[in-house]
Curated annotation (Swiss-Prot):
The UvrABC repair system catalyzes the recognition and processing of DNA lesions. UvrC both incises the 5' and 3' sides of the lesion. The N-terminal half is responsible for the 3' incision and the C-terminal half is responsible for the 5' incision. The lineage of its organism: Bacteria, Pseudomonadati, Pseudomonadota, Gammaproteobacteria, Enterobacterales. Residues 204-239 form the UVR domain. PROSITE patterns: GIY_YIG, UVR, UVRC. InterPro entries: GIY-YIG_endonuc (IPR000305), GIY-YIG_endonuc_sf (IPR035901), GIY-YIG_UvrC_Cho (IPR047296), Hlx-hairpin-Hlx_DNA-bd_motif (IPR003583), RuvA_2-like (IPR010994), UVR_dom (IPR001943), UVR_dom_sf (IPR036876), UvrABC_protein_C (IPR050066). GO terms for biological process: nucleotide-excision repair; SOS response. Residues 16-94 form the GIY-YIG domain. Interacts with UvrB in an incision complex. It is found in: Cytoplasm. Belongs to the UvrC family. This is UvrABC system protein C. Keywords: Cytoplasm, DNA damage, DNA excision, DNA repair, Excision nuclease, SOS response.
Amino acid sequence: MSEIFDAKAFLKTVTSQPGVYRMYDAGGTVIYVGKAKDLKKRLSSYFRSNLASRKTEALVAQIQHIDVTVTHTETEALLLEHNYIKLYQPRYNVLLRDDKSYPFIFLSGDTHPRLAMHRGAKHAKGEYFGPFPNGYAVRETLALLQKIFPIRQCENSVYRNRSRPCLQYQIGRCLGPCVAGLVSEEEYTQQVEYVRLFLSGKDDQVLTQLIARMEKASQDLAFEEAARIRDQIQAVRRVTERQFVSNAGDDLDVIGVAFDAGMACVHVLFIRQGKVLGSRSYFPKVPGGTELGEVVETFVGQFYLQGSQMRTLPGEILLDFNLSDKTLLADSLSELAGRRIHVQTKPRGDRARYLKLARTNAATALITKLSQQSTITQRLTALAAVLKLPAIKRMECFDISHTMGEQTVASCVVFDANGPLRAEYRRYNIAGITPGDDYAAMNQVLRRRYGKAIEESKIPDVILIDGGKGQLAQAKAVFAELDVPWDKHRPLLLGVAKGADRKAGLETLFFEPEGEGFSLPPDSPALHVIQHIRDESHDHAIGGHRKKRAKVKNTSTLETIEGVGPKRRQMLLKYMGGLQGLRNASVEEIAKVPGISQGLAEKIFWSLKH
């Protein structure tokens, strides 16, 4: 128990009503957030002589102050608890590190509706299908839909300004509603309805209607039309036969859990209208000594109750763990959704099969993650030995990206003992320097990054400067001038110069701007971790630079592809029906655009994919 915090006096003031409590350390930082049906009873349990775990002992030893917020109901307390966890990110809570919104397929409400991927708030008029686990799953589905139901996917700006059909029409991927006379309103509306039914899981209705149309076309001796519909029927059947589908038209999330070596993996399977839309693995941050029950309960609460991720609640949630607060969670989710949400932990039949699949995926993902972590640990240990450091707990790496001095962006990526810490990656827009002056850009980003107070835990052990002697000299000069309240001599500054022809494995490392550098063997684990963080920094900088260019010039990512100038860009968008159509096109289809060679088509294809 803390010597400073008077627990006995505090507990006398605590009510027995439901509510939320926040625990603070000596620095005024929230270190734990919890909820309780009975605040007095719950808080008293922290100050018994026989505490439940070492984690609780470590937590209680740091408490200097506790704030209590009383709520009307336990459901209210649960919602408030997860809002506070998201706000404060306390180190003794299990934390779900997932701030991305989930993508949907959007069917617009236009006269001739279009299909597109959508993230974020649902303001536009139309229908939304999903959620999908990631953008790749959406793009894959859109490409498939375009082959079966050829309705447009081009942007409205392209659609409204066409006088003749694009290449998508020529290859049978679009009915061409942009040009009068190519498709009847009735036929286009019918295809849109098929898409709507298909995305709603009503494949049987689609097939029934298509078969009826095929038979009618045959009776009317319209054999070409009948053959076209026959091909469409076969395409729908091929897709539905490949899918893991429940006949019940289920709308549910299936959550499997694996826990080993202090690390947890929670795998979520997204099922809508009986179709598996995809899945995703999560690795919540788990404080040492945390029990599996707390991991699962906290994850599920944060996953659904922190609403900024635009999460869509299913009608049912299947769980691979028997929660102690299952009824409370179901009530809270039902209140949030405005309809009844069921939480099941012992399903049967197809649902048990779903749960087994989620559990298997969680275990597989955890094994892979632990293997990767072991590799990272070995590499960091090897690098620490090379640099003569006791250990490396945190590394930061910087890179600069620009085109002919324009839209300069600096990136900072962070690795900890587990590898990339993507939540702490940062980009810096560089301004007020001579265009193309990489030294000035590095000087500016380092001053912005380190010329302020930094928490002890976030002071890096190693700072990698991508660029060799000149950039390292800038870093040394900046750190010599820093006047900050933290130990500026703690980080080891290391310059990394690319090898001849920029080949991996030939990098030269510099401790000082003067003198000769040194190289590591190409198979050195220490070199591999340097290459990893350097490449991450490079990719992060280029990504930021491309976004900045696209924003400034209001153009697509086509502008960043070498060999694609304004005329070719215009031709590509014109023939493919917009950027979405181009993204979904194959190399062969891109190569059919006038002025695009096979080699350039491959470059465009891979640039848009990656």
